[in-house]
Amino acid sequence: DTSEFDPLANKEYTEEQKQKLEQEQKELLSQTTTPELEADDGFIVTSASSAQSTPSISALSGNISPDSQTSDPITKAVRETIIQPQKDNLIEQILKDLAALTDRDLAEQKRKEIEEEKEKDKTLSTFFGNPANREFIDKALENPELKKKLESIEIAGYKNVHNTFSTASGYPGGFKPVQWENQVSASDLRATVVKNDAGDELCTLNETTVKTKPFTVAKQDGTQVQISSYREIDFPIKLDKADGSMHLSMVALKADGTKPSKDKAIYFTAHYEEGPNGKPQLKEISSPKPLKFAGTGDDAIAYIEHGGEIYTLAVTRGKYKEMMKEVELNQGQSVDLSQAEDIIIGQGQSKEQPLITPQQTASSSVESPQYKQQVPPITPTNQPLQPETSQMPQSQQVNPNLLNAATALSGSMQDLLNYVNAGLTKEIDSNKQIDLIKEAATAILHNAKSDIAEKQTNIIALAENTVNNQNLTPDAKVAGVNAVLETIKNDQNTPDLEKSKMLEATVAITLNSENLEPKQKEQMLEKTVDVGLSLKDDASRAAAIDGITDAVIKSNLSTEDKGTMLIAVGDKVNVSELSNAEKQKLLGSVLKKGVEAQVLSPAQQQLMQQNLDKITAEQTKKDTIKKVNDILFDPLSSTELKTTNIQAITSNVLDGPATAEVKGEIIQEITNTVAGSSLEAQDKAEIVKGVGETIATHSDTSLSLPNKALIMASAEKGIVESKTNLPDRELMTKGLVDGIYEGKGGPEITKAVSSGIDNSNINDSEKEALKKAKDAASEATLDIETQNLTEGLKGQNIEEHKPRDDIYNKAQEVINAVNPVIEALEKPKAPVVSAEERIVQETSSILNNISKLAVEKVNNFRAMLSSNGNFKTLEKKKEESIKKVDELVKAFGTKSSTEEQQSFIKANLIDDKTLSKEVRLQTIDKLLQEQTQKQAEAIENPSVKTEDVRVVSGKSELKPISKDTPDIEKAKMVVGRDRVNIKENIKIMGALMNARDSIQSENVNKSTPIKRE
């Protein structure tokens, strides 16, 4: 395994050389140089008179002396067979990763950096030594194929060097197996004496085999491995017996305490070089990395992962620290044990021991530690670890006193809490405190000896301990409890329903704590709800939210704070990614419980109900649009059938319990969906027309006029904001207006279309175009509506006693009322005064009603096109035509006889097509009003003289009037005049109405206008 690389390797390999080297390595792996299948411990010693010390043997960068001129064959062999091939393979993988990097500028920068440095330094020592490049190195090392190559190179290299430079191969002072002897205590203790080549004793090594109660460590992939046996070697710190150098290379053991085969052997090597006094000094330690320890005590054994297997090294944590201190002293460096400890212990992101590079000159120095992320730390859990993001680690990220939670828990829960509290007291970095709490939570949930009930009890105790710990800041308490909750969430062994109970208990602890502020309590509550909503099945989620809600209601919080907490629960449910149906259920349950417990204020109830209504509306909208799409994309359905079905859906929406605003949103989605469909524009316009008609004709009792207008505006907004082209939207806008008029919608409904356009998010030019389309549709519809006013009279005799509409009904009533009066006057018998007076008044009232109805009808038409409705063409037309209308009315007034007036109507209002329809119709409206007003005045005026009656009626003789009966005489005069004027003016009104029918039929209906007598 190689986390670091020698900066001074001086050979670059061609592809052919690499292939040749790889073949040699494969051959080395297949060789059997000794009869033993197991790997042996080895050592190499030299006397004090040796020309140079033997360098260490390791695949780790910096462990080879940085003297490029060295002629030591072992050094060269290590460089050429281990270090440089590993570096070449690593650079090759880094370049592949850079080619796939999204940030192309950074990728190109790093590629150039590598290429330029290779020209100056083929070993790329600067690149590998730059902390800024760790993320690229780490990412490359994550590649499984590369890792296999590096491990293969390392194993083959060790084997080659040990065999080539062994005593058995004839190398003077070379490596030779350690002969353990003096077995004591049933083979638990062994020893060997190490001598230099002069036969002088350098030291005695003691080895102790420890057969322990199995403990568990985790591999990088999260799987657990039990260690049942390991050994400890008492590596010497000071050597003062004899002169010379010594290199001890001890094979790493498998998890069961046995030695691996030679082709898989890896070693822990201690390098003792001759010091100034000739005595060996510990100058360097070489081992595969990252090195980890199975605990925090000095007796914790070291272990590594290599080739997917766990191996223990013959050194404890205490011995390793002692050796490291000696290495740094002998290198002339000060020792920072806290820093060394930081690097030794791997928790969270992996960290390794500092790399101590022995120098061959007096000016030697310690190379800066280099880090990598490769093998995860010890963990007592079988939970798969999530891969860490490649990044440049910080030297202070690791907690040197991180708890071995599994070991602590093996005693009792109180032991675990004691360890946790001790760590929290000692550690001031909140991030490390949280790591400690999370590690403890993991140990609790993965303790194989505990049942579910015990795990629940212990996890709750840990949460309570976190909340009440005085060494944690409020924010750290929040983060600590959240870490416990996150551990519960990620645990794969605890059933979700059991998790929901843990969540409820955690909420109860946090809310009832006197050591937290409301803000912190709410933050913990929200995290708990998040975890509850993340459970896998709906039953567990419902149980979690119900439990949390109950915990809030039963807590010792004030009623106001309880309401606030329930609102927080509801908000979390509301913004979750669950289905609307499940949201309805969960939020409805929270609301129901809150109302029943009387902890929600009216305002809070209203807010939660509004959120519930929105969820309901969203679900309704979703369901509705699905139905609409099914209808639109039905290939066997005609446009007429599509329209009918979508009208039915629209009607159901309008009849629903939602608010008008929500109904508007749904209708907007309907029209938007129709507009965005692939149907022909004319078909879409027909469907939209049906929607408009359905809204306009909907019952006023269930949907008020303002709400209809609001919904109609939404319908138009759905059209105008669709992605279809502008001409199609214009056509659909016209269709919507047509639907309004088909449904007899009033001016407010029509104006709402303009409001929908104004409130849309389209640009101004499109808004103007759509308003023009709406106004054009309104004008065309007005013509149709005006003609419909007389539709009931077409083809009918005015004298027939049949139902009439509006003005024509009243006109017929006048005729029916006046005829008996005329007939009575023409008979010789005297009329009854009271009856005549009554008829006069009724006639006057009817005529007034005619006038009012005419004015009202015309004003209604005008209101549809008024300036408030944004129908600007009406204003322009009024400005242009008002003068012409006045001229025509004035000219009509100059005609004294009925015949002249009828001729004027025909010539100027029917035949003269140079005048606009608008001008002619307005003239007729005004003349009708004048005629009705004139007759009303005639009926009510009692001072008209007999001769006026005779002149007007065409009589040539004056009849004497009895002075004895003045009342009758007066009645005769008034009624006589009234009779004449009404009869003639009714003829004029009939002519005006015929003219209007004719004008209206010019573009709408070519049938012959009805002639009125």
Swiss-Prot record:
Keywords: Cytoplasm. Residues 47-61 have a biased composition (Low complexity). Its main location: cytoplasm. Residues 12-27 have a biased composition (Basic and acidic residues). Residues 62-73, 348-373, 380-396 have a biased composition (Polar residues). InterPro entries: Rickettsia_antigen_120kDa. GO terms for cellular component: cytoplasm. Coiled coil: none annotated. Transmembrane segments: none annotated. Residues 1-73, 348-396 are annotated as: Disordered. This is Antigenic heat-stable 120 kDa protein. Pfam families: 120_Rick_ant. It is found in: Cytoplasm.
